Swiss-Prot record:
<feature type="transmembrane region" description="Helical">
    <location>
        <begin position="261"/>
        <end position="281"/>
    </location>
</feature>
<dbReference type="Pfam" id="PF01061">
    <property type="entry name" value="ABC2_membrane"/>
</dbReference>
<feature type="transmembrane region" description="Helical">
    <location>
        <begin position="194"/>
        <end position="213"/>
    </location>
</feature>
<feature type="domain" description="ABC transmembrane type-2">
    <location>
        <begin position="46"/>
        <end position="284"/>
    </location>
</feature>
<feature type="transmembrane region" description="Helical">
    <location>
        <begin position="46"/>
        <end position="66"/>
    </location>
</feature>
<keyword id="KW-1133">Transmembrane helix</keyword>
<dbReference type="GO" id="GO:0140359">
    <property type="term" value="F:ABC-type transporter activity"/>
</dbReference>
<dbReference type="InterPro" id="IPR047817">
    <property type="entry name" value="ABC2_TM_bact-type"/>
</dbReference>
<dbReference type="InterPro" id="IPR000412">
    <property type="entry name" value="ABC_2_transport"/>
</dbReference>
<keyword id="KW-0472">Membrane</keyword>
<feature type="transmembrane region" description="Helical">
    <location>
        <begin position="86"/>
        <end position="106"/>
    </location>
</feature>
<keyword id="KW-0812">Transmembrane</keyword>
<keyword id="KW-0813">Transport</keyword>
<keyword id="KW-0934">Plastid</keyword>
<protein>
    <recommendedName>
        <fullName>Putative transport permease ycf38</fullName>
    </recommendedName>
</protein>
<feature type="transmembrane region" description="Helical">
    <location>
        <begin position="133"/>
        <end position="153"/>
    </location>
</feature>
<dbReference type="InterPro" id="IPR051784">
    <property type="entry name" value="Nod_factor_ABC_transporter"/>
</dbReference>
């Protein structure tokens, strides 16, 4: 009896030790892969700069072009810039996430990805998590600069609690789009096809969301498409948080004849979107490389 108890304790100790060693190696892999991506960014800072300049141009040009458009959000009547600004924040994070697979597909074309896949990695998911972490940091840096410019234009920041929740919505979108972008890099043969798909998806996803116009201004068929767009479930909560000093997760974001949504439901939809992307990534990674 004592012998069995002793073996059981030794088995548990070995499992705990193995788990801690596994976690250590995973973090080490993650650190090295993320460090490599930041070294690439340091050598090619145009990625960071262009990710800031493009949304700024959209904010300045579209904000001026539709400044007198009769949109109304909360008590902010006829202020298109205030309406458009959350859409630009989301577009900044979305564009960076959509382009996140470009370094990976170049790694594959130059043979570096094959070296990673045959290396004794603790987990191949470190490839996904390193890209997601890097893109999250890069996107939040870009969003931070857009926020500073928005303050310069007279757009007030929301309360700290609302700001944290806004960042969390952006983080969920970044994770989901990054996952699907990396899936494209694994499935498409070369960077030419990937860039073509990115160009095809970029603007249609933006225009079919509520970034440029509210749902009330859209025809019925476009409202349905917009309700299927993950950007909408990031833009609408952030827009609400920017225009309301007090809110609840049950606060309604929009109501249509066939659909209504609140902040909490938007959060759940984005979490499901991320989980679906992660499960697809896991399945495709195994089918391709195992």
């Amino acid at each position: 009896m004592n012998f069995k108890l002793k073996n059981l304790r030794l088995s548990r100790l070995n499992q705990e030790k193995s788990s801690s060693v596994t976690s250590f190696f995973f973090i080490q892999e993650l650190f090295v892969l993320v460090k490599r991506l930041f070294i690439q960014l340091k050598r090619r800072p145009i990625t960071l700069i262009s990710g800031i300049l493009q949304p700024l141009l959209w904010l300045i040009l579209f904000g001026a072009l539709f400044q007198k458009a009769p949109f109304r959000i909360s008590n902010l009547e006829n202020n298109y810039l205030q309406f458009f600004y959350p859409g630009i924040l989301v577009f900044t994070a979305f564009a960076g996430s959509l382009n996140s697979s470009l370094p990976l597909i170049f790694d594959r074309e130059f043979g570096f990805l094959n070296r990673l896949l045959v290396a004794p990695l603790n987990s191949r998911f470190s490839i996904l998590f390193s890209s997601a972490f890097f893109i999250s940091v890069l996107s939040f840096i870009q969003v931070f600069f857009i926020m500073l410019f928005g303050v310069f234009l007279g757009i007030q920041l929301p309360p700290f609690k609302s700001l944290i929740v806004s960042f969390f919505f952006l983080f969920l979108l970044i994770i989901g789009i990054t996952t699907f972008s990396i899936l494209l890099a694994l499935l498409l043969p070369t960077h030419i096809e990937l860039i073509a798909v990115i160009f095809v998806l970029n603007l249609p996803l933006l225009f079919s969301s509520t970034a440029l116009a509210p749902l009330d201004f859209m025809p019925s068929w476009l409202q349905i498409i917009s309700c299927l767009n993950p950007l909408t479930y990031t833009i609408e909560p952030i827009r609400f948080l920017y225009s309301h000093s007090s809110w609840l997760f049950s606060s309604s974001l929009f109501e249509l004849s066939f659909f209504s949504i609140n902040i909490g439901q938007s959060l759940i939809i984005l979490i499901i979107f991320d989980l679906v992307g992660f499960l697809l990534f896991k399945k495709i990674l195994k089918s391709i490389f195992i």
